[in-house]
Amino acid sequence: MNRKIVLLFMFLTTLVIFSKQVSSEEYNVKEVECLVEAIYFESRSEIFDGQIAVGNVILNRVSSDKFPNTICHVVHAGYYYKNGIPIRRRCAFSYWCDGKSERMVNAMAYRTATDAAILVLAGFVVKGLEKSLYYHADYVKPNWVKERKFLRKIGTHVFYK
């Protein structure tokens, strides 16, 4: 096994053991699955900090009065047809309404997204993103960026509050 992977696993395990415990009453299995899925599809090609940052945005939205108050409702927010299918390009998180399958087939990326979700739920926040509520890929320029305060860029994602 690759030494870097073993060291990363040991580091993450140590962080989880010594971090504050996540209340099972606060986040049920479905909520954790929604967070892992969003991190996987929105940022699996990003560095680990970038994946945690995406998770930070999701939890910050859950805590904000401007957004739904559960992880799944935040991740699945958007416009839907009457039959319940999300309208393409009208979702808060693009993967949810891109018309593609939500099957997580890359085992290593799934494990990394799971590790990121665990750390986010344990309270880890990427420095400078404590109040982040928005992000986008750096290859697009949404109209809403004019109304937001830039916080920082991590990998190919740009974060705002």
Can you name each region flagged by the protein language model?
Residues 21-161:
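Bacterial extracytoplasmic/cell-wall-associated proteins, especially those involved in peptidoglycan
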Residues 15-21:
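C-terminal segment of classical bacterial N-terminal signal peptides
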Residues 5-14:
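Sec-dependent N-terminal signal peptides
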Residues 1-2:
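N-terminal secretory signal peptides that target proteins for export/translocation
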